[in-house]
């Protein structure tokens, strides 16, 4: 009996250890974003507008573009005329360029393409003609290049599909985390899966069957490969529920069927015409699942890909808007099947009577207001009187040949080629020091439910279930050959999993080990944080595990020790700081989804670096870079979700000596917030629109003050002027300031061309000088970030027959002003001087200015013509007779 008891005890202990192995705990995934379940406070408009610290913003201009602006625009001088332009990636079909002075559209723009856009534009000279083209990564995995005239070039980069085994998902371990053996291509796979299933059923009958996911890491061109498996998330037991009815899930990134209970930050506003997916998942309330202690109703998320008229909130007119309304203005057309399902709207917590303060209004109209739309419901009259008068008129028949069509799929019995999609901005850098620039693209692979809702398209796939194939990879292109250099395959999952294998955020490139090669950092929605070298090899101790990572990984010196730290955030409200070796420094739980990577800077002016984090609950947190503690008086509470990256900028007026930075952001309550860093005193501007894109800053109108650029989901672009003087290091022209810098540069670190040489001018002779200044004001104990590797490049377009890129490199060991001698080309043309600097940690800083060469030679010709005439006139005056001589008279002599 004793031996049997011992055997039973050993078996129980073995089963318990296996259970703990298969369902390993992770502190980041176990936490919940509880603040997202709370309602937003009511807006006191009088208190907001009657601020005690006005920033005195003035609206300089406002322009409407063709559709919603989801990705952050780019500020640049694209045609080397000395004037800044704003490159706006409209969400649907168009890339636009606005003149910074007045917001007018430049001639030749907008430029058309067939896809949607989730990424910001970049500048790169793809054809080596001395003029940088505008690179735009599209949703359908193409990187297009546009000339400054708006012409779409034939050169483009195409991301190949990912090939996976058709039955890769069959027999997988549920929620695997044991990485000691692969979960695919394993002979004993089915036996282990059946044993685990039976063990799970016996030990925990009340636990719901977990979803199946697997993380794969495999280099396609290498000899060695491995497969790593990762636990999605422990299913909720007892008092833990899958999803709560209170925060009605919002449909973000709906082309990936975002039916999970997360607020995916990488999506369009639900209900807009340009929604990434016109499918709405239906939330079915399972009344049989009631939490015992919290008494909260559990909801089950239907993963159906079909268009549903049973939307949360206003389901009544879902189908009519889609089937009847076929003509109207593109920006204003309503589509009920894509109705807004805001997680903090009126459907949430109605029992508590909390009024939601947001500009996302899902409520019905009053009778008088509703009657005013009767004319618009006369569809026949509307088509006759309205259709042909507007350039944004929508007739679905006219757009049939302009929509994207996927290429033919390869027919295979054993494998599936998954469509590639790009949901974030690529990065351009020379990661391997070969002198050739590479483009690093984070790619998500899946079958778009909207596209394959068409039976003809679905038929091409051979009857597979498209929900079983979601994957992610890093694809690196050689920009000289325009070919794929290498591919690193990362995660692989199904759509039914708690965590799915998308990549929503741009990769970050930085030198982690000081070898001069750039490493690639990326976080995936599968919850894994990868760090790989310039060849795609995963670094030791990586990947690190968190919940779904939506924001970019930030590489910066956050604790002022002179070394790079890595900061990651996730959808469960976690933020963590790591060393470059993957060791945790500190972590904090903010209790709300973090949609974007944090911004770095000395916010309160105390000489120490802070980490500033936006959340979907509306709270803006300022954390100490040393230990992650909350800096008071933060968090600052807005009245709507904050879904964009925060701008940190010095808005001090001329002569003002205040320390600290201003936090600038938009919120889903329709206000633009300007929060004083040291005091959190706030000034607001009522723009009445929502925004996912970052607020940008620069002197775009040619004056001497700093301007703010705000773009919205309604397709409006605003330019606000501030009384703060402009400085090149205050400018924030793109979300990553060129490559990998998420930190404020002014009074911190950077390089810029001095005011004496950055002005637009004409150069003659054989050489000219450019003066730069390196700024490095890191404080003790870190010291300086030297050495500084400065590369100066002169881009020469036009009819110049020599080298179009004239490059000089110099290493400086201390900050200060330096003069660089550059050659003057012997033709009449324009030019752009780019100054790029990388410090010892590989952080990238840049500045640029434009100039002309020999453009005013006709002034010399003018003097060559005028001077001889003036000389002759002078000689006539000098050589005139000195004595008076009577003039001949022709009068008649009357004496004769």
Swiss-Prot record:
Pfam families (UniProt xref): Beta-sand_DEX1, FG-GAP
A GO cellular-component term linked to this record: membrane
Annotated spans, Disordered: 268-354
Disulfide bonds, paired cysteine numbers: none
Signal peptide: 1-24
Bilayer-crossing regions: 859-879
GO biological process, one term: pollen wall assembly
Tissue localization of expression: Mostly expressed in buds, and, to a lower extent, in leaves, roots and seedlings.
Superkingdom of the source species: Eukaryota
Phenotype upon gene inactivation: Male sterile. Defective pollen wall pattern formation at early tetrad stage; delayed and reduced primexine deposition, as well as abnormal rippling of the plasma membrane and no production of spacers. Random sporopollenin deposition on the plasma membrane along the microspore wall.
Start-end of Basic and acidic residues biased regions: 330-352
Keyword annotations from UniProtKB, A to Z: Cell membrane, Cell wall biogenesis/degradation, Glycoprotein, Membrane, Signal, Transmembrane, Transmembrane helix
SUPFAM superfamilies: Integrin alpha N-terminal domain
Cellular compartment(s): Cell membrane
Entry membrane topology: Single-pass type I membrane protein
Keyword hit for Translocase: no
Extracellular side: 25-858
Glycosylation site residues: 20, 204, 211, 239, 253, 266, 279, 295, 302, 307, 317, 789
One GO molecular-function entry: calcium ion binding
Biased composition (Polar residues): 272-290, 300-326
Function (record text): Required for exine pattern formation during pollen development, especially for primexine deposition.
Name of this protein: Protein DEFECTIVE IN EXINE FORMATION 1
Protein species of origin: Arabidopsis thaliana
Name of the gene this protein is made from: DEX1
